Curated annotation (Swiss-Prot):
It is found in: Plastid, Chloroplast thylakoid membrane. Chlorophyll a PD1 binds at H198. The record marks A344, S345 as: Cleavage. This is Photosystem II protein D1. NCBIfam families: psbA. InterPro entries: D1/D2 (IPR055266), Photo_II_D1/D2_sf (IPR036854), Photo_RC_L/M (IPR000484), Photo_RC_L/M_CS (IPR055265), PSII_D1 (IPR005867). Its EC number is 1.10.3.9. GO terms for molecular function: chlorophyll binding; electron transporter, transferring electrons within the cyclic electron transport pathway of photosynthesis activity; iron ion binding; oxidoreductase activity, acting on diphenols and related substances as donors, oxygen as acceptor; oxygen evolving activity. One of its GO terms (biological process) is photosynthetic electron transport in photosystem II. It catalyses: 2 a plastoquinone + 4 hnu + 2 H2O = 2 a plastoquinol + O2. It is a multi-pass membrane protein. Keywords: Acetylation, Calcium, Chlorophyll, Chloroplast, Chromophore, Electron transport, Herbicide resistance, Iron, Magnesium, Manganese, Membrane, Metal-binding, Oxidoreductase, Phosphoprotein, Photosynthesis, Photosystem II, Plastid, Thylakoid, Transmembrane, Transmembrane helix, Transport.
Length: 353
């Protein structure tokens, strides 16, 4: 009888825990994805802050030339970064217990791998938590689908690209100038500006910003006034009201006359689907582009495409970009390579006696 009561009590304890985890009445929804999300994101954030402040220099290129990234080792907010794991480690899983000492782990850039892997797991769980909360509330799942775009982009630069290049040392550093360095080196080695998927991503981000500004300004400019001229239009509304706060017909009429009739949406669902889909699809394509360039399927190469009747090259912008790429590649890892890989890969002319 005692065992039966204990079992029933423990079952109810587990049941109460499950109810609390999945309750939509909590101020912040936890969910089963949150059970994994919270510790992983807390770990990634804590280690990032500590390492950004105090981590010793990291031998990123594996050539015994450590690079400083933390504030206590001479950096500021702009130049500071979490330096990627050493090329000597490559793609090996490198937790603290795999190193001979904590000093060795820090020297080889162990914190970068720890932060990145916990962060990716955490943001993936955040996406799952968005779906889970939508499901509990009877909503459709598109919020999580939209969030998949930045998750895919993060996975591309922190995981897929290092896998394709063979080392976590090629991942994006976790800092401002480190991000710019990653972008410059990526352009030098993969010609990303000439990749159509990157072009689609640029159109998605800039187009999304434009459409967001247009939509917000149109809505704000076509509010249905519920107040007199002597008080703010904002005073005529309450949060969560069922009635529409703006006149979409007026906004449609304005924009249709500003551009032309069919450039404007007169259906709210179509409009908001477009506003969500445009940047999301663009960022999906960018993530896909990074993931293909990770395996060296690079941007278009139009170098020396135009020649005159004598066979002399007439430079185009493609050749100017190529020269810039070579210059950037020369400066990258300057002590690890004697000259750019593009030049090193050219077959030497045969010398006959």
């Amino acid at each position: 009888m005692t065992a039966s009561l204990e079992r029933r009590e423990s079952a109810s304890l587990w049941g109460r825990f499950c109810d609390w985890i999945t309750s939509t009445e909590n101020r912040l929804y936890i969910g089963w994805f949150g059970v994994l999300m919270i510790p992983t994101l807390l770990t990634a954030t804590s280690v990032f802050i500590i390492a950004f402040i105090a981590a010793p220099p990291v031998d990123i290129d594996g050539i015994r030339e450590p690079v400083s990234g933390s504030l206590l080792y001479g950096n500021n907010i702009i130049s500071g970064a979490i330096i990627p794991t050493s090329a000597a480690i490559g793609l090996h899983f490198y937790p603290i217990w795999e190193a001979a000492s904590v000093d060795e782990w820090l020297y080889n850039g162990g914190p970068y791998e720890l932060i990145v892997l916990h962060f990716l797991l955490g943001v993936a769980c955040y996406m799952g938590r968005e779906w889970e909360l939508s499901f509990r509330l009877g909503m459709r799942p598109w919020i999580a689908v939209a969030y998949s775009a930045p998750v895919a982009a993060a996975a591309a630069v922190f995981l897929i690209y290092p896998i394709g290049q063979g080392s976590f040392s090629d991942g994006m550093p976790l800092g401002i100038s480190g991000t710019f360095n990653f972008m410059i080196v990526f352009q030098a080695e993969h010609n990303i500006l000439m990749h159509p998927f990157h072009m689609l991503g640029v159109a998605g981000v800039f187009g999304g910003s434009l459409f967001s500004a247009m939509h917000g300004s149109l809505v704000t400019s076509s509010l249905i006034r519920e107040t007199t001229e002597n008080e703010s239009a904002n005073a005529g509304y309450k949060f969560g009201q069922e009635e529409e706060t703006y006149n979409i017909v007026a906004a449609h009429g304005y924009f249709g006359r500003l551009i032309f009739q069919y450039a404007s949406f007169n259906n709210s669902r179509s409009l908001h689907f477009f506003l969500a889909a445009w940047p999301v699809v663009g960022i999906w394509f960018t993530a896909l582009g990074i993931s293909t360039m990770a395996f060296n399927l690079n941007g278009f190469n139009f170098n020396q495409s135009v020649v005159d009747s004598q066979g002399r090259v007439i430079n185009t912008w493609a050749d100017i970009i190529n020269r810039a790429n070579l210059g950037m590649e020369v400066m990258h890892e300057r002590n690890a390579h004697n000259f750019p890989l593009d030049l090193a890969s050219v077959e030497a002319p045969s010398v006959k006696a």
